[in-house]
């Protein structure tokens, strides 16, 4: 029996597990998640509403050293594919402008339908499992786990295929702490410098301090030597 191990139990890891199990029902699929629950970051996405996708999906929406890479990714999928995936799971989707949300308006609905499908497909789920090392062995891999400070991690399983779905580095509390980059490096992949794409603005002695945490439309202008060099609205 083919064994596919998926490192990371966020939305990408769960989606990968669902797709793998549906495409090959005979395969053994295992999700290895280092948090005590799956999809923890889903629950805070979109202020708890979970924006699933955006109908305005073009390379201009992204910044990259290689625009061709962005184009290649976009060409392989679409927002319609995303809607179809979730509706097939039993999740009605609604549009608000270009944004797509679960009709319930609750991120918990997304997590609920995904975990239900994982159970239906018989996907194995291992929580509180911190993967420290993945070693190529023959045509497969040995997967080792332990704590971040563990000097002698233990092998927990062998796998024929491994999918890294660890997320980025944007939300350590929810699980995206950058450990996936280290695992990718161990296979010889090159990681470009990681920078945040969405950050808060810190100001002093301003009435905006009282508005901390409030989300609203606005316009930002960047001045250099008294001249506007860039403006953006959103």
Give short role names for the model-derived ranges.
Residues 47-96:
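Glycine-rich active-site loop/strand segments that organize a redox cofactor
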Residues 78-87, 97-121, 234:
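An accessory alpha-helical subdomain
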Residues 69-73, 100-105, 166-174:
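Flexible, glycine/proline-enriched loop segments at strand-loop-helix junctions
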Residues 1-12, 30:
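Beta1/beta-strand and adjacent pyrophosphate-binding region of the FAD-binding site
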Residues 108-109, 116-234:
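Predominantly flavin-linked oxidoreductase catalytic cores and closely associated redox partners
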Residues 12, 16-21:
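Small-residue (primarily alanine) positions within well-ordered alpha-helices
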Residues 5, 21-47:
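Glycine-rich FAD pyrophosphate-binding loop
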């Amino acid at each position: 029996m083919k064994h596919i191990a998926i490192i990371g139990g966020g939305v990408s890891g769960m989606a990968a597990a669902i797709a793998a199990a549906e495409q090959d029902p005979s395969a053994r699929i295992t999700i290895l998640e280092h948090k005590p629950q799956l999809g923890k970051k889903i629950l805070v996405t979109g202020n708890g509403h979970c924006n699933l996708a955006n109908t305005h999906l073009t390379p201009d929406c992204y910044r990259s050293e290689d625009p061709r890479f962005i184009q290649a990714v976009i060409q392989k999928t679409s927002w319609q594919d995303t809607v179809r995936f979730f509706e097939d799971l039993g999740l009605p989707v609604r549009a608000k402008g270009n944004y797509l949300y679960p009709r319930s308006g609750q991120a918990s609905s997304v997590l609920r339908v995904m975990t239900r499908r994982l159970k239906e497909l018989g996907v194995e789920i291992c929580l509180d499992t911190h993967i420290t090392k993945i070693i190529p062995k023959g045509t497969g891999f040995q997967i080792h786990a332990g704590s971040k400070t563990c000097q002698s991690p233990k092998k927990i399983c062998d796998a024929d295929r491994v999918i890294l779905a660890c997320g980025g580095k944007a939300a350590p509390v929810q699980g995206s702490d950058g450990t996936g980059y280290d695992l990718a490096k161990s296979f010889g992949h090159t990681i470009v410098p990681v920078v945040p794409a969405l950050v808060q603005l810190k100001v002093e002695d301003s009435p905006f301090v009282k508005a901390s945490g409030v989300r609203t439309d606005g316009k930002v202008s960047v001045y250099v030597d008294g001249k506007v060099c860039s403006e953006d609205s959103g």
